[in-house]
C-alpha cells in the first residue's frame, strides 16, 4: 500500500540534496491531504525552489523517477519569486488546501483580502457555468456523465470558499 508520508519524506531528502539551500518549500495537496485517496489516486506535491530554471524542472523529473510509485506523482513546482507574485485571488484557497512539510507556505505568498476570496468565488462560478453550458451543447451525454466527478470537485472548492467567507472557517474535507 502507498504511504504518502514515506513518499514525501523520501522526496524531501532527495530534493534537499539536489537543490540544497534553494529548496524553499514542500507541501501536500489533494486527495491524500483530504483523506480521500484511493488506490488509483495520485499524490499532489507542491514544491518551491528559489531562482527556478528549466534545468531545475528536469532535475525534479529525474528525482521523481527514482522514487517508488513515481507514476503517482503529480502537483506543482514553481519559483519563490513567481509564487510571491501569484494572483491573490487564489492564495486563500492555496494556503488552506496545502499542508506544510518543509517550509511555511503562508510566508511565501502575497497577502489576500476578503475581496480576493469573493472574486475567486465569482470567477470560479463563472468558469463552472461556462463549462457546464459548453459541455451541454458540445459534448455527448455519456461524456458529460463521465465528467461529473470533476464538476463535483469544482463545486466543492467553491463551497469551501463560500463557507470560509461566511464563517471564517475553511473546511478541508467533503
Kindly label every feature range from the protein language model.
Residues 23-32:
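Short gly/ser-rich loop at a beta-strand->alpha-helix junction or flexible surface loop bordering the NTP-binding
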Residues 85-107:
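Ordered, amphipathic secondary-structure segments that act as subunit-interaction surfaces
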Residues 75-80, 106-110, 139:
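Short acidic, glycine/Ser/Thr-rich loop/turn "cap" segments at secondary-structure junctions
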Residues 49-55, 102-112:
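Short, polar/flexible loop-turn hinges at active-site or ligand-entry regions and domain interfaces
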Residues 111-174:
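Conserved nucleotidyltransferase catalytic core and NTase-mimicking acidic/glycine-rich helix/loop elements
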Amino acid at each position: 500500500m502507498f504511504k504518502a508520508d514515506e513518499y514525501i519524506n523520501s522526496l524531501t531528502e532527495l530534493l534537499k540534496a539536489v537543490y540544497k539551500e534553494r529548496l524553499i518549500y514542500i507541501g501536500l495537496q489533494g486527495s491524500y491531504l483530504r483523506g480521500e485517496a484511493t488506490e488509483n489516486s495520485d499524490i499532489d506535491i507542491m514544491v518551491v525552489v528559489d531562482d527556478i530554471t528549466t534545468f531545475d524542472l528536469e532535475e525534479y523529473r529525474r528525482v521523481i523517477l527514482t522514487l517508488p510509485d513515481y507514476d503517482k506523482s503529480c502537483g506543482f513546482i514553481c519559483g519563490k519569486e513567481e509564487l510571491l507574485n501569484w494572483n491573490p485571488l487564489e492564495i486563500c484557497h492555496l494556503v488552506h488546501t496545502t499542508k506544510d512539510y518543509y517550509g511555511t507556505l503562508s510566508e511565501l505568498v502575497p497577502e489576500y483580502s476578503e475581496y480576493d476570496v469573493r472574486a475567486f468565488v465569482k470567477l470560479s462560478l463563472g468558469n463552472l457555468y461556462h463549462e457546464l453550458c459548453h459541455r451541454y451543447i458540445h459534448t455527448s451525454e455519456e461524456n458529460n456523465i463521465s465528467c461529473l466527478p470533476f464538476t463535483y470537485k469544482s463545486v466543492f472548492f467553491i463551497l469551501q470558499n463560500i463557507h470560509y467567507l461566511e464563517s471564517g472557517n475553511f473546511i478541508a474535507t467533503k
